[in-house]
Design a protein with these regions (language model features):
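N-terminal amphipathic/basic-hydrophobic helices that include classical n-h-c signal peptides
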Residues: 1-9
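Extreme N-terminal starter segment of soluble prokaryotic enzymes
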Residues: 10-15
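General beta-strand structural signal in soluble alpha/beta enzymes
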Residues: 16, 48-51, 99-101, 140-142, ...
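Gly/Ser/Thr-rich loops at beta-strand to alpha-helix junctions
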Residues: 20-24, 28, 53-55, 144-152
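Alpha/propeptide regions of enzymes that mature by internal proteolysis
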Residues: 28, 32-51, 58-59, 133, ...
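Glycine-rich nucleotide/cofactor/substrate-binding loop typically near the N-terminus or early
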Residues: 36-111
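PLP-dependent amino-acid enzyme catalytic core
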Residues: 45, 51, 96-99, 111, ...
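Glycine/threonine-rich beta-strand-loop-alpha-helix active-site module
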Residues: 120-123, 127-143, 148-182
Length: 182
């Protein structure tokens, strides 16, 4: 009896920290919806919203909002090698970028039924990192969730200029051949 009285008569500080609700709400939209419902039920409470990310889809937007930085588009390739514009978030003051690799090699970017893991790679992520370096970026904060790839960064390393060879000195062209790495 007294517990409910004190809960309703005292103002509380509430921190709302959601991730996205995949396919329905971004983390920011989820935080706003939760805050709206909470405020309707307990109008005296002090609410603070802090949308979060697990490093996958939505990571860039959450970090950009937190850091107060702007978006810039870069040409690049998705996990299947198709060209697209890839958003990154840049802080020119400290030569820093926020990279959401799901925007380059994300599972959500693939058409339905197109998930063939042996044909997908992170080459586009490497291309993006090269462009960021050319733009003066010195530090990257990367979210690497939501990926359609499992190439252990092989494609990214190749885009950055690394070469891999088998015991016969033949260059390895696909990550699935890494078991032959010398």
């Amino acid at each position: 009896m007294f517990g409910n009285f004190f809960l309703r008569s005292m103002s509380r500080q509430i921190l709302i920290v959601p991730d996205k609700f995949k396919g329905t709400l971004t983390a920011a939209e989820a935080a706003e919806a939760i805050a709206s419902g909470w405020a309707a039920a307990w109008p005296g409470d002090e609410l603070e919203q802090l949308p979060m990310s697990d490093g996958g889809d939505g990571f860039g937007e959450v970090m950009a909002a937190s850091l107060g930085i702007g978006e810039r588009l870069f040409p690049g390739a998705d996990a299947a090698g198709r060209e697209r514009e890839i958003p990154c978030w840049l802080n020119a003051e400290c030569n820093q970028a926020v990279v959401e690799t799901a925007q380059s090699n994300g599972l959500a970017l693939l058409p339905s039924g197109r998930f063939h893991p042996f044909e997908l790679d992170t080459f586009g992520v490497g291309q993006l990192l090269i462009q960021l370096g050319q733009a003066g970026v010195k530090t990257c904060i990367a979210g690497i969730g939501g990926s359609a790839t499992n190439d252990a960064g092989f494609g990214m390393a190749r885009a950055l200029g690394w070469r891999f060879f088998d015991e016969d000195g033949q260059e390895i062209q696909q990550w699935i051949q890494l078991d032959k790495l010398a």
